[in-house]
């Protein structure tokens, strides 16, 4: 990064703060006050970050990781507030000093948010959003800002950047949207990068590129980087030191290598032991209870509730799903299916065929934009194929001679979406979100049975029943994903399509959910 007079327009005191950037947090306490109760999001948090360091903050969903990051740049949503403690940059307190925060936010502190869908403005092209950010903080002409924007997209791994920069956010896959967000964060050459789950939506090859980029920037520019993640692989490969959080408390912190090799707290042990081995297949993930003992069966009691309402199906080895030469073409010039395909059309799925039998688990893997999610949406009826045949349980749902007949399988095929926030109705409480599909497919269900089913489902995904009376925005990303899973299970599906179902979850919760899905399948 070449910084051309980066502090010329700032007064001397702010220049000093920026050039000697050092993040220090002392006894930080953050809480959310509601009418019924006060929820403590963080309690007595203490840590420092020096230039050239990469600090990892890891912990289960709802442990307070993202809240700490938002507090640093004064972006805590109401009714959240800092009740006590100190946040410093080079020994200068930032509380109630909005002018200083505005000077450094964006230009000297870059932020990568967890949810790329809600971080980008759906009404503006990527080009406009990048140029606006660059010209707000850097003295560049429109053409210079445009060229810098194209270079940034190429740097974060977006092919054909000159063309893609003209697209809107919805025209990118989840992983590609996250790359755009990262490009925005580094666009103004910051001194500190706060990355909240920066690689959650990216495939492994692009994850590696982004993490290498962060390490390279840290070394060349002598940056400070805070990475908030649930991915222990990211922690091991990238960070110098790590903080483990649980229920708003720091339960362990230290050198990354020492902590991973010899975790002392049960929380740290749980995160380390839940990482699956790459050299062998395992039947179940190991889990650690809060007292430090190993859990041999994580969901035995929960599956009893499933069997009670679901029933037990015999494994017949029956063919459940078949795709025959499925092709999907998106024409960016017209929404008409009858228009002749032109040179700008995107062939998202090309001649794909496979079968799935009852009791089987099929893994569909590929880089961002390879067509994985499009195939999932075709099977569930959210996207209509251009060509090919689709059969479910012996019924033809689509072929070249018939209308799309996805209603035949409605309810029996359910999907867990990649982005938990945009797939949940923000106006519904969790109770209503889970109950809605049950009421739709079981018209005559009694109120008591409905309530019992909802309670069982929220138990299954490891959340308290108090959460049923809250709204989606009141939860962390991982907790929202668990709500999505509960809703998908509500109709007792025969085929469950999981589009990155654990991407927003920490590794210990990933292990619980995957063990649970395996138990449901076995039953």
Give the predicted meaning of each segment.
Residues 73, 77, 380:
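Helix-to-loop junction immediately C-terminal to a conserved catalytic motif
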Residues 82-93, 388-398:
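Conserved ABC transporter NBD signature motif
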Residues 106, 170, 188, 473, ...:
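Conserved signature/switch motifs of ABC ATPase nucleotide-binding domains
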Residues 144-163, 448-466:
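Conserved ABC ATPase "signature" region
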Residues 187-191, 490-494, 510:
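A short, proline-enriched helix->beta-strand linker immediately N-terminal to the Walker B motif
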Residues 253-254:
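ABC ATPase "signature
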């Amino acid at each position: 990064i070449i910084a051309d007079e980066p502090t010329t327009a700032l007064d001397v005191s702010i220049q000093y703060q920026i050039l000697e950037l050092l993040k220090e947090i002392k006894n930080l306490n953050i809480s959310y006050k509601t009418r019924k109760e006060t929820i403590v999001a963080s309690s007595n948090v203490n840590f420092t970050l020096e230039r050239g360091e990469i600090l990892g903050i890891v912990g289960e969903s709802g442990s307070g990781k993202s809240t700490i990051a938002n507090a640093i740049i004064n972006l805590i949503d109401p009714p959240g507030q800092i009740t006590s403690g100190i946040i410093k940059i080079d020994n200068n307190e930032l509380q109630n000093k909005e002018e200083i925060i505005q000077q450094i936010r964006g230009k000297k502190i870059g932020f990568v948010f967890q949810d790329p869908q809600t971080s980008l403005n759906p009404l503006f092209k990527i080009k406009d959003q990048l140029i606006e950010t660059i010209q707000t903080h850097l003295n560049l002409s429109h053409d210079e800002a445009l060229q810098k924007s194209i270079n940034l997209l190429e740097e974060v791994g977006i092919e054909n950047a000159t063309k893609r920069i003209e697209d809107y956010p919805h025209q990118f896959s989840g992983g590609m949207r996250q790359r755009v967000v990262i490009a925005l964060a580094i666009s103004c050459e910051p001194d500190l990068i706060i990355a909240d789950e920066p690689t959650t939506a990216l495939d492994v090859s692009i994850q590696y590129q982004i993490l290498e980029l962060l390490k390279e920037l840290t070394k060349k520019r002598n940056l400070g980087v805070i990475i908030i993640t649930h991915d222990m692989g990211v922690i091991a490969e990238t960070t110098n030191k790590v903080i483990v959080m649980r229920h708003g408390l720091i339960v362990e912190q230290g050198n990354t290598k020492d902590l991973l090799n010899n975790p002392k707290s049960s929380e740290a042990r749980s995160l380390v032991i839940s990482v699956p081995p790459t050299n062998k297949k395992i039947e179940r993930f190991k889990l650690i209870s809060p007292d430090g003992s190993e859990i041999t069966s994580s969901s035995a009691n929960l599956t009893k509730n499933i069997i009670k309402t679901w029933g037990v199906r015999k494994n017949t080895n029956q063919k459940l799903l078949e795709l025959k030469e499925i092709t999907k073409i998106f024409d960016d010039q017209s929404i008409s299916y009858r228009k002749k395909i032109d040179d700008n059309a995107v062939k998202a799925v090309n001649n794909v065929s496979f079968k799935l039998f009852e009791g089987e688990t099929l893994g569909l893997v590929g880089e961002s934009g390879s067509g994985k999610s499009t195939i999932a949406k075709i099977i569930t009826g959210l996207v209509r194929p251009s060509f090919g045949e689709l059969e479910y349980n012996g019924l033809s749902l689509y072929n070249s001679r018939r209308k799309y007949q996805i209603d035949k399988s409605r309810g029996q095929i359910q999907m867990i979406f990649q982005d938990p926030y945009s797939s949940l109705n923000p106006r519904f409480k969790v109770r209503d979100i889970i109950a809605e599909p049950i009421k739709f497919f079981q018209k005559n269900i009694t109120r008591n049975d409905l309530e019992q089913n909802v309670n069982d489902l929220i138990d299954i995904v490891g959340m308290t029943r108090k959460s049923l009376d809250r709204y989606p925005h009141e939860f962390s990303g991982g907790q929202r994903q668990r709500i999505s899973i509960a809703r998908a299970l509500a109709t007792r599906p025969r085929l469950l399509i999981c589009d990155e179902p654990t991407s927003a979850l920490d590794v210990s919760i990933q292990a619980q959910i995957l063990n649970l899905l395996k138990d449901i399948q076995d039953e």
